[in-house]
């Protein structure tokens, strides 16, 4: 039965990617974006281990384009996340101050002892939270001071990526948009969860890219790459787009949408194709040279989980850009009536 329904099977939960022969990694844009949120130590571990393992890396053209467009936003966004962390803890002081003001307004001497106790509690909480923030989040800002022209992460990404796909011309994009309308109506993945984006678009090099088809464009470029893969090659698509048009949620464990694996297999039946989420991938790469039971390995796993779960919701001057490119960090566990 496995031969007929291979799209429902995966060996990845029991295999370390370092043990896969003839492996090619294809990264979605969000994988590069998350690198900016790790501290310098984790960044170094990622790039060092990727080089040591000799992984072959390919990215579709539109992954590279989205990364270049959003890179400056991500550098700014790291500071925004740190500011949100600071504001969250400052809100504790605000609540305590409001409580004290409300109690003091009664002007009752009997409440003096209570007010003194609240002030003492406020001081203790403030000291405790300040120490916690200092120990855990002070280095959360861009530790290596990336700026637009001096970006160490981009330099290492440039060195890491072996191959970048070619762009689609306007005629090819029009075909994808037309085909995309039909796929979206039939809930064929990927991208139908982005149909609500309407006809918003952006331009690059004189070419119009419609936002709601962003995932589909990248997927078509992945399929184009698969056409020319060698027999026996194992291609792993790594993405943290967790919407239900990429993954199916089974008991809190995400498995690749069977339709995507089936479509990949229909393009090239002589290769192995699978998908992996960002947290699984970063865990395997960043701790590959550590004792899996060590404190350092556990600390790395914890930081990966915290970083992946950071909800990036920029505001003020960054809000417009966030809305324009919100596909980069999209989460959606709501299962729909897919084709499977």
Predicted regions and their residues:
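Short beta-strand/turn micro-motifs composed of small residues
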Residues: 239
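Active-site-proximal, substrate-binding regions of enzyme catalytic domains
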Residues: 2-235, 243-339
């Amino acid at each position: 039965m496995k031969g007929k329904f291979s799209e429902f099977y995966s060996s990845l939960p029991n295999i370390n990617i370092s043990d896969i022969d003839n492996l090619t990694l294809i990264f979605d844009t969000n994988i590069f974006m998350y690198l900016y949120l790790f501290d310098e130590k984790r960044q170094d571990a990622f790039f060092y281990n990727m080089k040591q393992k000799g992984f072959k890396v390919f990215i579709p053209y539109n992954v590279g384009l989205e990364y270049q467009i959003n890179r400056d936003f991500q550098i700014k966004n790291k500071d925004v996340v740190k500011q949100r962390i600071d504001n969250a803890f400052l809100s504790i002081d605000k609540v305590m101050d409001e409580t004290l003001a409300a109690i003091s307004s009664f002007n009752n001497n009997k409440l003096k002892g209570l007010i003194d106790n609240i002030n003492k509690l406020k001081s203790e909480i403030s000291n405790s939270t300040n120490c916690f923030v200092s120990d855990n989040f002070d280095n959360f800002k861009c530790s290596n001071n990336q700026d637009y022209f001096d970006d160490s992460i981009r330099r290492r990404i440039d060195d890491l990526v072996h191959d970048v796909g070619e762009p689609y011309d306007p005629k090819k994009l029009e075909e994808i948009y037309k085909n995309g309308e039909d796929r979206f109506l039939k809930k064929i993945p990927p991208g139908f969860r982005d149909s609500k984006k309407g006809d918003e678009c952006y331009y690059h090099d004189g070419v119009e890219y419609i936002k709601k088809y962003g995932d589909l464009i990248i997927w078509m470029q992945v399929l184009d790459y698969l056409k020319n893969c060698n027999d026996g090659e194992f291609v792993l698509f790594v993405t943290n787009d967790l919407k239900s048009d990429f993954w199916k949620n089974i008991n809190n464990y995400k498995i690749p949408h069977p339709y995507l694996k089936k479509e990949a297999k229909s393009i090239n039946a002589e290769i192995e194709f699978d998908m992996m989420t960002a947290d699984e991938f970063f865990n395997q790469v960043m701790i590959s040279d550590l004792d899996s039971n060590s404190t350092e390995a556990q600390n790395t796993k914890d930081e990966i989980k915290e970083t992946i779960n950071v909800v990036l919701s920029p505001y003020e001057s960054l809000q417009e850009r966030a809305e324009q490119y919100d596909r980069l960090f999209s989460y959606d566990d709501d299962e729909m009536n897919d084709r499977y």
